[in-house]
């Protein structure tokens, strides 16, 4: 029987030796639903972070980074007492007695409007990978990511892409008919996967909950 610690904690984690859990690597995230590493190592670790009311986001995670929740949702100010009406001002730096105190809160590289807004793109970002495969040459070096569904009741998952930028938000678009992949998926998209060659897959279901036998895995291939 192993009665010792069930895992190790890197001694350079930002909260080691100070108030807070030693396990914490980054914070200020609302619901980091999935994470993935750039297999080429250029951008490191991505986290898709499901928003509360207005914005979905994807961030690049760094050691000790504070991503602003719950004073920011995406790049926008957030008020937990009134989540549908962003305040005009909010903190923009890390507070005292926190790792990286005095440094700027970290904004996402991708954000888009949630379906709870009139012009929302969909319900919950579910996964994303920096594409390093070869089959979809036009998407090489782009972040490909998934949306659970266009609306909360119908299986209308969607796929998007974002082009990395040196600063600010990455330019994004939807994968639609006529593009390398038709991203208008007639299923709920539960998540994505990546194989040893960098090619991408999506896991889907036609049910909103884990029932039935409609689960499928699809590989993204050129049209």
State where each predicted segment sits.
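Beta-propeller domain segments
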Residues: 1-175, 187, 210-215
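C-terminal structured "cap/appendage" subdomains that terminate the fold
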Residues: 166, 175-198
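Blade-level signature of beta-propeller repeat domains, shared across WD40, Kelch, NHL, RCC1
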Residues: 193-223
């Amino acid at each position: 029987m192993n009665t010792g610690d069930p895992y190790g904690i890197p001694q350079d984690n930002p909260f080691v030796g100070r108030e807070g859990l030693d396990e914490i690597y980054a914070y200020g995230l609302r619901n980091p639903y999935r994470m993935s590493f750039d297999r080429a190592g250029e951008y490191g670790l991505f986290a898709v972070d499901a928003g509360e009311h207005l914005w979905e986001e994807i961030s690049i995670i760094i050691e000790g980074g504070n991503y602003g929740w719950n004073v920011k949702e995406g790049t926008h100010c957030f008020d937990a007492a009134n989540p549908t009406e962003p305040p005009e001002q909010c903190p923009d730096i890390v507070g005292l007695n926190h790792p990286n105190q005095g440094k700027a809160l970290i904004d996402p590289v991708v954000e888009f409007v949630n379906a709870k807004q009139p012009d929302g793109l969909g319900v919950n970002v579910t996964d994303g990978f920096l594409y390093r495969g070869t089959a979809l040459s036009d998407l090489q070096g782009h972040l490909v990511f998934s949306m659970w569904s266009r609306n909360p009741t119908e299986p209308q998952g969607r796929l998007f892409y974002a082009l990395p930028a040196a600063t600010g938000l990455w330019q994004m678009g939807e994968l639609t008919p006529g593009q390398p992949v038709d991203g208008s998926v007639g299923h709920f998209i539960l998540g994505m996967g990546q194989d040893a060659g960098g090619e991408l897959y999506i896991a889907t279901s036609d049910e909103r909950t884990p029932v039935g036998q409609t689960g499928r895995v699809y590989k993204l291939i050129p049209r």
